Amino acid sequence: MATYALQMAALVLGGVGMVGTVAVTIMPQWRVSAFIESNIVVFENRWEGLWMNCMRHANIRMQCKVYDSLLALSPDLQASRGLMCAASVLAFLAFMTAILGMKCTRCTGDDENVKSRILLTAGIIFFITGLVVLIPVSWVANSIIRDFYNPLVDVALKRELGEALYIGWTTALVLIAGGALFCCVFCCTERSNSYRYSVPSHRTTQRSFHAEKRSPSIYSKSQYV
């Protein structure tokens, strides 16, 4: 029962991580306008994401435009686009693999050893996905902070950390936690199986020992008669 609860908790974390990965990939709030020094133009707000940039003026609806070319992106955003797409695919693959290894799933049979190995595979993929999400989010955040404190960068070009980065860090931790729980499920299953097989063998050894101990006395009585 405890193992099944761990499976469900890990699956929920994996599902949340998968949704978060897709959300971070499509969100435009990776870089947002920084209102500092002479750039205190609060009626204009700019967002920059992996696929589009958005601008909102005072009393005007937010307007977004898809990038015309991949080369229009900075190197960190170009790499982040590829890594986040790969992370989305990995998260979906890990989630579907985890469903196949769940205790309530019947299409993969009832063998606990097979299912535990499937869950271990899903856990490893979830863990790798968390690292893949963590790399681009931290990379972009580092470039934003570096440019923010660089005196050679114009104030109008400086940006702040957007909401997508914070969600990305949270998503990476959730994915890693889900993968760790699936690995714990595998360890618990292997431990219970080893205990289950070790107890009968121990009892069999005791029985054979008692049988050997009784046999000489029986033989001696028959020989005496």
Swiss-Prot record:
Q: GO:BP terms for this protein?
A: calcium-independent cell-cell adhesion via plasma membrane cell-adhesion molecules
The knockout outcome noted for this protein's gene is:
Conditional knockout mice lacking Cldn8 in the collecting duct of kidney show hypotension, hypokalemia, and metabolic alkalosis.
Q: Give the recorded effect for K213R.
A: Resistant to KLHL3-dependent protein degradation
PTM info: Ubiquitinated by the BCR(KLHL3) E3 ubiquitin ligase complex in the kidney, leading to its degradation.
Keyword DNA-binding appears in the UniProt entry: no
Give one Pfam family, short name only: PMP22_Claudin
Give the sites of the cross-link named Glycyl lysine isopeptide (Lys-Gly) (interchain with G-Cter in ubiquitin). Answer: K213
Q: What is its main location?
A: other
**Ranges per topology, Extracellular:** 29-81, 139-166
Subcellular location as annotated:
Cell junction, Tight junction; Cell membrane
Query: Which reaction is the catalytic activity of this chain?
Result: chloride(in) = chloride(out); bromide(in) = bromide(out); iodide(out) = iodide(in); fluoride(in) = fluoride(out)
Q: Where is this region: Interactions with TJP1, TJP2 and TJP3?
A: 224-225
Q: Which family does it belong to?
A: Belongs to the claudin family.
Protein's name in the database: Claudin-8
